[in-house]
């Protein structure tokens, strides 16, 4: 490349250099000088013109680094996005944020619906007939079936109370994956952190309807506040959310039971507060987030593991299980033993089922939408029924959807390109670690070892579980969801009893967040990316391999690095972050850093946070 010739008042720039730079400079030089023509040899600009460009404000004058750092830095990008998506009005979109991820996910969602509708026009085999039945059930108003399930719920509850069978009730709830996230005893199956090829039962914390759990103590704190505090915006907002939550519970009661007071809103609210109090217990020393408990020791923590496991479906009770908190387990089990049959707790037990049943009933869905999506998340419009049905379809037919989506949209050229890019970026990452000045020799050695073994999985997860052909109904979504959940629970139990290999039942590719009602597993048709420390793997789903995240047409390596390159480096960096560094190169729970390494890492991270907070 030739040298740029510089004179006191004039700068000469080669045409090819100008072409490279003009995409970076906000306004091309030619607009400032008002020249009519750009010659092939040079483009003449004065120093004064360059100074004008540098001094020109690139944001609204009211936006400064001190009052709005994010918008100051990203002003042009945000402006371009608004222009790009201006055709999507608030009345048309059903998602909260307008960005490349949501726009692309909406595109993929519609492609999935199209795939389903094309198949069910003329189903050719049993699976396609089952797909048709389930899809129809998820978009059909089934009030008669809903009331049948509601009646059955009361019969089931009364039976457990009559038999004084707390552990049977808890087992019954935990068989239902859609409901158990609200249960005080929350069971799941997870990888054994000390042996990635084994699974273990985990007893953990529940989740709550309100994301900000401090709101459950609102009525305890309110009397202690001054008038000045009550006039603050934060107090008024908290009060609004709490009242809307109580109204939401009351609306469900009124819609389902009329004037009968079956579910008392304050009873549900107070039970959840009692559960939160149990989380604050601190009587047991040496507690951790990964406790192993032998079945003969479970009674020490007021937990009847043997009875609970049998209620789940175990024929032979496992000898050991994992617990997120011994303090919580001990306190919440005592709370349950003393109170589970009281009227207050009956409101809670009915509520946790009705909450989920209403979401999958078209006649009732507006009630949970108003609180969970509109008020808490700001979603402007209900999700279209066919798009919402994809949650249930992904749950019950993930293998089918994955197969059909891959057949239609797999791009081998993109897959190979991303793999090669990943390999090159790993080399750069290893070079950075090699040149690192603050890691200990131990930390540096383990980091390089981990990067040598990190893998990339592109497109679709390996060993996706085939969809069972169960006896689904075409007019009862709740029945179908529960039927599949029971089947899945049985398979998870088989993982623990060594009847099947973990590789045969990889449920990682079909996880649903039932609290948020969104796909959070590694489905190939979600627009996201992942790093999993237990297998030391980066995963890029097929749905991510499309515009704007990757395109190989005339936009250059800079564009590719900004999108898919940035995604790959972001995910691979998780292998060495605060959480990823807890696992070795083979995915086993083992620190790869020394204590000094971790202290230095934390200090650097905090310094970066402070730097941003200074300007924010």
Where are these regions (language model features)?
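Extracytoplasmic/secreted envelope proteins and their assembly/folding machinery
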Residues: 63-66, 70, 109, 113, ...
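Beta-sheet entry/capping signal
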Residues: 68, 198-202, 528, 536-538
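Extracellular/luminal recognition modules and glycoprotein regions
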Residues: 45-106
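Compositionally biased low-complexity segments enriched in polar/charged residues
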Residues: 1-8, 12-45
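Pocket-edge structural micro-motifs
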Residues: 73, 205, 542
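Secretory-pathway/luminal and periplasmic proteins that interact with or process carbohydrate-rich
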Residues: 77-80, 276-285, 454-465, 575
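Noncatalytic, helix-rich "gating/capping" subdomain that lines the substrate-entry/channel surface
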Residues: 105-425, 461, 473-474, 478-479, ...
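Intrinsically disordered, low-complexity linker/terminal regions across diverse proteins
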Residues: 45, 89, 268, 295-298, ...
């Amino acid at each position: 490349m030739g040298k740029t010739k510089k004179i006191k008042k004039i700068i000469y720039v080669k045409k090819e250099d100008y072409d490279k730079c003009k995409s970076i400079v906000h306004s091309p030089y030619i607009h400032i000088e008002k020249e009519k023509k750009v010659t092939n040899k040079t483009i003449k600009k004065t120093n004064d013109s360059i100074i004008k460009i540098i001094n020109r404000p690139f944001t609204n004058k009211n936006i400064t680094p001190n009052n709005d750092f994010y918008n100051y830095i990203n002003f042009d990008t945000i402006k371009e996005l608004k222009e790009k998506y201006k055709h999507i009005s608030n009345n048309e979109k059903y998602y909260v944020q307008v960005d490349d991820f949501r726009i692309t996910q909406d595109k993929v969602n519609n492609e999935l619906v199209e795939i389903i509708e094309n198949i069910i026009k003329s189903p050719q085999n049993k699976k396609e007939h089952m797909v048709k039945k389930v899809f129809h059930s998820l978009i059909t108003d089934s009030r008669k079936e809903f009331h049948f399930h509601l009646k059955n719920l009361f019969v089931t509850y009364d039976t457990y109370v009559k038999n004084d069978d707390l552990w049977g009730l808890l087992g019954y709830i935990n068989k239902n994956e859609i409901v158990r996230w609200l249960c005080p005893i929350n069971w799941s199956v997870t990888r054994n952190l000390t042996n990635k090829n084994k699974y273990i039962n985990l007893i953990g914390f529940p989740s709550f309807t309100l994301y900000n759990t401090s709101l459950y103590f609102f009525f305890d704190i309110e009397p202690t506040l001054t008038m000045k505090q009550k006039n603050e915006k934060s107090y008024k907002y908290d009060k609004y959310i709490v009242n809307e939550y109580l109204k939401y519970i009351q609306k469900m009661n009124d819609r389902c039971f009329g004037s009968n007071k079956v579910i008392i809103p304050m009873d549900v609210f107070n039970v959840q507060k009692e559960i939160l109090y149990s989380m604050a217990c601190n009587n047991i020393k040496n507690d951790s987030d990964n406790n192993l408990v032998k079945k003969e020791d479970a009674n020490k923590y007021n937990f009847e593991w043997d009875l609970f496991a049998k209620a789940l479906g175990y024929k032979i009770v496992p000898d050991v299980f994992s617990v997120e908190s011994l303090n919580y387990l001990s306190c919440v089990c005592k709370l349950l033993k003393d109170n589970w049959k009281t009227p207050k707790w009956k409101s809670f037990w009915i509520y946790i089922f009705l909450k989920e049943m209403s979401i999958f009933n078209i006649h009732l869905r507006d009630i949970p939408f108003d609180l969970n999506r509109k008020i808490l998340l700001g979603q402007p419009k209900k999700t279209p029924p066919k798009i919402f049905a994809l949650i249930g379809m992904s749950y019950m037919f993930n293998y089918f959807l994955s197969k059909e989506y891959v057949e239609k949209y797999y791009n081998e050229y993109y897959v190979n390109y991303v793999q090669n890019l990943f390999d090159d970026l790993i080399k750069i990452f290893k070079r950075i670690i090699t040149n690192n000045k603050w890691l200990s020799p131990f930390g540096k050695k383990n980091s390089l070892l981990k990067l040598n073994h990190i893998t990339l999985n592109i497109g679709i997860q390996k060993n996706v579980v085939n969809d069972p052909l169960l006896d689904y109904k075409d007019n009862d979504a709740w029945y179908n969801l529960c039927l599949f959940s029971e089947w899945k629970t049985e398979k998870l139990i088989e993982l623990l009893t060594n009847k099947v290999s973990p590789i045969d039942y990889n449920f990682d590719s079909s996880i649903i967040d039932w609290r948020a009602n969104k796909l959070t597993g590694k489905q190939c048709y979600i627009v996201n990316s992942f790093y999993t420390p237990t297998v030391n793997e980066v995963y890029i789903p097929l749905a991510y391999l499309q515009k704007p995240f990757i395109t190989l047409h005339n936009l250059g390596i800079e564009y590719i690095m900004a999108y898919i390159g940035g995604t790959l480096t972001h995910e691979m960096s998780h292998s060495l972050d605060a959480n990823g560094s807890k696992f070795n190169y083979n995915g086993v729970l083992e620190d790869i850093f020394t204590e000094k390494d971790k202290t230095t890492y934390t200090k650097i991270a905090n310094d970066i946070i402070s730097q941003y907070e200074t300007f924010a």
